[in-house]
Regions:
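Gly/Pro-rich interdomain helix-loop hinge
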Residues: 58-113
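Short acidic alpha-helix initiation/capping motifs at coil-to-helix transition points
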Residues: 4-5, 46-47, 91-100, 117-123
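Catalytic-loop motifs flanking and including active-site residues across diverse enzymes
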Residues: 2, 6, 48, 66-70
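Glycine-rich phosphate/pyrophosphate-binding beta-alpha loops
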Residues: 35-67, 125-127
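Short, amphipathic C-terminal "tail helix"
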Residues: 113-148
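Carboxylate- and glycine-rich phosphate/diphosphate-binding segment that chelates Mg2+/Mn2+
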Residues: 1-44, 132, 138
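Short alpha-helical scaffolding segments that buttress acidic/His motifs in well-ordered protein cores
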Residues: 30-38, 71, 117-122, 143-144
Length: 148
């Protein structure tokens, strides 16, 4: 319930927040979306996206950037039909692609770091166990390699 409430707000208000930077109502609604997301995560926990994001965060990539870059690749690699399993999956991916998200080279993260990042991610066992599908280290490495 909490995550869906947050997603609904994001669908409506994120584009306005980006294109109308002085729109206080849009910013307030995104604050609510963030709160709802936090409540959802407190109850359900996080999964493989966050597990892999920790490896990027360790290298200076901001949390939101890391999760945005990893959301679609992780879900496509691990789920058989993410469009059917995750509400609004395609729409969320399109929104992410439209955001002005920096690439990893801005943070001096290189493709050669993929193996080390995958190994580090495997240490996030609680998050990986919470994911609906197994994420072997080889798969994680491929996900990281494909970010470049």
């Amino acid at each position: 319930i909490w995550s869906m409430a947050g997603i609904e707000l994001i669908r409506e208000w994120l584009p306005k927040t980006i294109h109308e930077r002085d729109n206080d109502e849009a910013r307030q609604q995104m604050l609510f979306a963030s709160f709802f997301g936090g409540v959802a995560l407190a109850h359900a926990g996080t999964t493989a996206v966050h597990a892999l994001a920790y490896s990027l965060g360790k290298r200076g990539v901001p949390h939101g950037v890391a999760n945005s870059l990893l959301f679609e690749p992780v879900m496509r690699a691990t789920l058989k039909a993410p469009e059917e399993q995750i509400p609004y999956f395609s729409e969320l991916c399109t929104m992410i692609h439209r955001l002005p998200i920096p690439t990893l080279d801005r943070y001096d993260v290189c493709r050669k770091d993929a193996a080390a990042m995958a190994a580090e991610a495997m240490g996030q066992t609680r998050l990986l166990q919470n994911h609906p599908a197994e994420v072997p280290e080889k798969m994680a490495r491929g996900i990281f390699e494909n970010l470049f």
